[in-house]
């Protein structure tokens, strides 16, 4: 599901786009088809996709939900990052300094 969320957030999958069939995706991801079936059902319950009998499964997500998913994913990544950095002994002020240095280096790189 996270793979589909990321693709939707990045704009790689848009409303109306057909996603692979459950069987196709199971083969591509090399996972059990039952796992994919459960994931597709969950995405339908979350109103991320819609399955049209005989036609396939299509992205059907509104912009508000997309923004909410993006924020939740960013928060999850940030929580993981902070937790790992704290485990390494870094303080919040260290993280801010490191992030500022990183962003300055990226800006200089882009110029």
Model-found features: residue ranges?
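A short alpha-helical element within helix-turn-helix/winged-helix DNA-binding domains
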Residues: 18-29, 43
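Beta-hairpin "wing" of winged helix-turn-helix
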Residues: 12-13, 17, 45-54, 58-61
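Short, cationic-aromatic polyanion-contact patches
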Residues: 21, 55-72
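Extreme N-terminal segment that seeds HTH/winged-HTH DNA-binding domains in transcriptional regulators
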Residues: 1-18, 24, 72, 76, ...
């Amino acid at each position: 599901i996270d793979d589909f969320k990321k693709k939707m957030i990045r704009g790689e999958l848009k409303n109306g786009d057909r996603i692979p069939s459950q069987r196709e995706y199971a083969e591509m991801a090399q996972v059990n088809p039952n796992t994919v079936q459960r994931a597709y059902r969950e995405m339908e319950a979350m109103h991320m996709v819609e399955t049209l009998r005989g036609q396939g499964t299509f992205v059907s997500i509104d912009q508000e939900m997309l923004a909410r998913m993006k924020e939740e994913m960013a928060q999850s990544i940030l929580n993981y990052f902070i937790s790992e950095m704290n485990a390494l002994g870094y303080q919040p002020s260290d993280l801010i300094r490191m992030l500022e240095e990183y962003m300055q280096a990226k800006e200089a790189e882009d110029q």
